[in-house]
Amino acid sequence: MLDAVVVGAGPNGLTAAVELARRGFPVAVFEAQGTVGGGARTEELTLPGFRHDPCSAAHPLGINSPAFRGLPLERYGLEWLHPGLPMAHPFPDGSAAVLSRSVGETAASFGARDAGPYRRLIERFLPRWDTLARDFMSLPLTALPRDPVTLARFGLVGLPPSTWLMRRFRDEKAKTLFAGLVAHVMAPLGGFATGAIGLVFALAAHARGWPVARGGSQSISDALTAYLKDLGGAVHTDYEVKRLDDLPPARAYVLDTSPTALARIAGLGSHYANYRYGPSVFKIDYALDGPVPWTAEEPRSAGTVQIGADSTEIGAALHAPSGTDRAPERPFLITVQPSVADPTRAPAGKHVFWAYGHVPNGWNGDLTDAMERQLERFAPGFRDRVLARATAGPAELAARNANYVGGDISSGAVSGLQLLLRPKISLFPYSTPHPAVFICSSATPPGPGVHGMSGHNAAKAVWRRLRQT
């Protein structure tokens, strides 16, 4: 009999399996798709030779993840590549704010009135970032905090809405860039603890950057898989699980699935009926015949580029999908240009580029024209560079990854208490009413992103139970 069976070979499922295998527990992973990866895949979606990431592409949380940093993934082929700038945010007047590795360069891009407030905000936490990241990404605490004082101070700043934190800034550049950071997890700007979201992304950039993985995000999943196999673990693909009886006998079952799917597989009825799914996105992957023709200079060397004219426009774009069930007329866009840092992603002289905007959960429209109008505001002539595009709305995203219910790439609404306490209000979020079944997906803390911490934290709960039985 196996000690543990993991369902789902995304970053969290693979990390959970690795953590258990490292401690000597026989483990096997079962994945419905033909390849491993979940939200960390790479495919040729447009033209031959253009390697696209269907979901996550830039990895500020991955390179800063305590889980990944504790594993020898570089030995198995993972290499982080850094663009000239982690992130840039252009404005209609041709200027831009930047999120640089340098706090000083970032602060200077906001202008004289906001440079000092930004420095003071960041420099309170950056020297203790590694400890803070471990404590924050282990909430609800799976162990005593290593630095409770810094964590408490961070909570005082981060738990209020991001709109409160943005009052520290007087001008629009700092406010707009920070609003865009919050929007990376599709959280409403006025929501509980959204200040913490923006701070985490900013601190992550200053600490270690916002890199891409050489060859694509698939490299992360492949490195985890190779390490797991070296530890004696097994991975089975093309294996759909509809109920626990489909799996071999094991002492523990660890599911990297949505709460809805877990309840169905484990026979838990309506246990997660109150779990809320959030807005979706409409995503476009592009093959380009040259770099994006940004008007501002800074985005040309940035790995990630945020598109929103000001914080008001961003707030409206976030409100429309969740508050009105309409797609925004001027969507806020998160864009990534991996080939700026990794020329292996496209043929010589060509580029890959992706962008997404927010839409209602389950929306079935086409946001292509609205998104490209936004891009043309900041990169005139963009459409002329397009060789091919591959679009994916909520239905296509959910078909690619069953955890994206209704196209929600955050695997659950990132708002209210569900931002921190998910999938239920509990100090033991990885446990379920079934004593042998655990959940390790992004529907558990610390939430969405390719960081493996949900799997890492869940593995702790699993091995504690295995040692007791």
Curated annotation (Swiss-Prot):
Cited InterPro entries: FAD/NAD-bd_sf
Top-rank taxon, per record: Bacteria
Pfam families assigned: NAD_binding_8 (PF13450)
PANTHER family given in the database record: DEHYDROGENASE-RELATED (PTHR10668:SF105), PHYTOENE DEHYDROGENASE (PTHR10668)
Protein name as catalogued: Protein p49
UniProt organism field: Streptomyces lividans
Name of encoding gene: p49
